[in-house]
Regions:
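Intrinsically disordered, low-complexity eukaryotic regions enriched in glycine, serine
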Residues: 2-87, 91, 110
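Residues within HEAT/ARM-like alpha-solenoid scaffolds
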Residues: 102-103, 120-127, 154, 158, ...
Length: 408
């Protein structure tokens, strides 16, 4: 490890370890870059911006002690041990700002999420949250992280109420880019969504230049979650006057599960059955980047596991094997079954079974977007091959496709 005294100080690792630093010092001696262990330790101290090894050691010892205390605090929270939480945080008030919870916002965020144990907030958990706020925890930590995490699940509304009573802001933007109202939109929790709206949350919260610039309605349409609650969430936002940049009534009514309105659209314009919608820039889920751009209404029904809509569309002449449009790079061309077969928790299996029963081609191949964490990845595969990749586990859907004779 060559050390140049002209270099700017190097930051310590996120979780510095004294043993690792000692090993680094020994490696310097072994490599001939320091004459003695003391000299090597001094070089390391200077490398990390300290004037001496004892000062570096004291700093790392302090950090390690803080991490141990934070781990103890998390264990106390997870077991709802209020007395232990009080003792730890009273002894060390800095624990109110310990890197716990989503985005390391703080212990209050972790308490509010009620993730461990996964349950509705108990009286003990609510008392814990109130004690933390009364004794130094910031209800706005991370941009109202506690309220954002509580709003992910309907059963946490009592926690949301407590946070609001203590000054939480329903119109805050977590981390500067995620409006609190987007939390129940992401997880499709209509109760928490309505609670936020009833308490002043603005659904028309679009902001140009933000990471997520759209309204709450646009966000709920684009979420990766799949649930029978989708229609209720859309209806709640429409009733609240939420707008959308998307002008596609037939698609929205399909997503709402309004078969009466879908039928009315199709009666008024039978060509909608075969239309390919270039504006559908949503539909990704199960870790894949594939969206519905250039796809048909049957693709939409397949993506959202809407068996009733799929049956209506096929009965009215929808092509089971309609291929979505290709982009300029030749990516796309997937048939509806690709969407139904690649869902978390076999959400699309009933639609897969229906499409196969009606003659879906299981040998068709397409070049499609890969994993969302690998933006340059594209894969050439069949419906079964895509289902094996996304969400990436053996499933009842994969088993069914194999039994149906699908090509790998």
């Amino acid at each position: 490890m060559p050390i140049d005294s002209q270099d700017a100080p190097r930051p310590l690792p996120d979780r510095p370890n004294l043993r690792h630093l000692k090993d680094q010092a020994r490696a310097l001696v072994k490599a001939g870059e320091a004459a003695t262990l003391s000299a090597a330790q001094f070089q390391l101290a200077r490398l990390y911006g300290f004037t001496s090894w004892p000062k570096l050691k004291a700093h790392v010892d302090s950090l390690e002690a803080s991490m141990r205390e934070a781990a103890e605090l998390k264990q106390a929270i997870d077991t709802n041990a209020l007395g232990r939480v009080k003792a730890l945080m009273t002894r060390n008030p800095e624990l109110h700002r310990a890197p716990l919870g989503y985005g390391e916002n703080g212990p209050l965020t972790w308490v509010a999420e009620c993730r461990v144990p996964w349950e509705a907030p108990t009286a003990a958990r609510l008392e814990m949250a109130q004690w933390m706020i009364d004794n130094g925890s910031d209800v706005h930590q991370g941009g109202d992280g506690p309220l954002m995490r509580a709003a992910l699940v309907d059963s946490r509304i009592p926690m949301m109420e407590l946070l609001l009573q203590n000054g939480a802001n329903v119109n805050a933007e977590w981390n500067g880019y995620f409006p609190i109202i987007f939390a129940p939109c992401e997880t499709l929790e209509p109760g928490a969504l309505k609670w936020l709206l009833d308490h002043g949350a603005n659904p028309n919260c679009g902001k140009a230049g933000r990471k997520y610039p759209d309204s709450a309605l646009d966000y709920v349409i684009g979420t990766y979650s799949r649930s029978t609650n989708l229609g209720a969430c859309i209806d709640t936002l429409l009733e609240a006057g939420c707008g959308s940049r998307r002008n596609m009534p037939v698609v929205v009514d399909l997503l709402r599960g309004r078969m009466d309105l879908l039928a009315r659209h199709l009666d008024g314009d039978p060509m909608l059955i075969q239309k390919k919608f270039l504006e559908l820039d949503f539909g990704s889920t199960a870790a894949r980047r594939l969206t519905l751009r250039g796809a048909t209404l049957l693709h939409v029904a397949a993506e959202y596991g809407n068996l009733e809509a799929a049956k209506m569309l096929v009965e009215r002449g929808a092509d089971i094997n309609a291929a979505a449009d290709l982009d300029e790079a030749g990516v796309g061309g997937q048939t509806p079954i690709f969407h139904a077969a690649t869902q978390f928790y076999d959400w699309g299996l009933p639609v897969v079974e229906f499409l196969v029963e009606r003659g879906a081609d299981l040998s068709v191949a397409a070049k499609l977007p890969g994993h969302y964490e690998r933006p340059d990845e594209f894969v050439d595969c069949s419906p079964l091959g895509y289902a094996r990749l996304f969400p990436g586990k053996e499933s009842k859907t994969v088993e069914f496709l194999r039994e149906a004779g699908a090509a790998e």
